[in-house]
Amino acid sequence: RFLNKKFKGLTLKIEKNRKIMFFDKNKQKIYDLKNKDKFLVKTSDSRGIWVGQKRYAGKLNIFIGDNNISVVNIIGVENYLSSVVGSEMPTKWPMEALEAQAIASRTYALKQKGNSVFDIDSTNKNQVYNGLESRTFKTKKAVRATRSLVLVYKNKLINALFHSSSAGMTENSQDVWKNKFPYLSSVKDFDKNNPKLKWQKRFSSEELQKLFPSIGGIKQIEILSITNTGRVKNVKIQGDYGSAQFSGLDIRKKMNLKSTLVRFKLIKEDDKPNTTSTTVLEDKPITYLVKAGDNLSDIAYRYNVSLYELVTFNSIKDPTLININQILLIPRNQVKNVSSSDKTLVVSGYGSGHGVGMSQWGAKYMATKGATAEEILKHFYKGVKIKPFKRYFL
């Protein structure tokens, strides 16, 4: 059912059990939304509709589903774009770069139109949309200057993909996904001025165990294939329990990496303590820390004893072999030893994003050197034309 009531000063509160309650300006509850209900929210306030810490123009449709609550912003394409441009690109960048972003984002949005509940996602899964908070004078000007203009290839809207930075060369679409699009071909990028072009991320053995539990973390990692620009296509990982192969995209998602233009290195840090934990009685830990290479009889290696003081002897060579249940007279089924490796995975990477289509940092550089929005777009999307939108482009 669709709720058809009018309220003023309305506040919506969403509970963890997906229950939605409405409160008036005096904070008095006036209505509960039930499962399968729909609710339309609109306002005459020029500041928009608040959702958490963000404001949105237009209207909001709220849907109560079996497993989720969907909040959909109903807004015209041009108004939507003035927020998208500021969400996707710093508004202090050159106007020609902002205009290129506006045309690419308009094309991308119209290409996605037609989802059963909403047309386009508001995150970087599609393109980022932060509502009125990212709308500025410059973004509105960029959208007005390019009003209705879209990118077409053979009189059809292109899939106008874009990304932050490719680190020198953009990627062919077929080398990242299966589909080949002639206009999404590898071209030179001009993104060397990106201050975050190079990056590095480290993963401890404990983190790797959590990321790859089925194979027991990472003992070895081998890159099986790369693209012409050096992006990882496939890797093989050997863990304590077995091995598995992953695509570069899978690894990027699983490890939350900025891109697939990466290299891996497993290092043994001699200065990093090995850790052995013994869990006793309801997962309460007794933890030992020993520096790799040290003689256990010469150091104090007992820390964080949570239940009992534990006395060990110089004859003990390896804390993982301490017969803790005998010393503390605790049943063996309540004692568990867990050892961790001292290997750390270092991921060194370049660029940010999938690397296909327009590079935003490349667009900025070209704009600072005098390129127009059209020149920027035709560099990154090969063989396209820029035309006012027509229905038959869909």
Regions found by a protein language model. Name each.
Residues 86, 90, 106-114, 213, ...:
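Sec-exported extracytoplasmic/periplasmic mature domains
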Residues 96-97, 102, 110-115, 139-147, ...:
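Exported/periplasmic cell-wall-interacting domains
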Residues 5-76:
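A contiguous strand-loop segment
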Residues 93-280:
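Extended substrate/cofactor- or partner-recognition/assembly subdomains adjacent to catalytic sites
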Residues 76-92, 189-193:
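Acidic/histidine-rich, surface-exposed loop or edge segments in extracytoplasmic proteins
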Residues 278-308, 326, 350:
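Primarily a LysM-type cell-wall glycan-binding module
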Residues 270-287, 329-344:
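Intrinsically disordered, low-complexity Ser/Thr-rich linker and spacer segments
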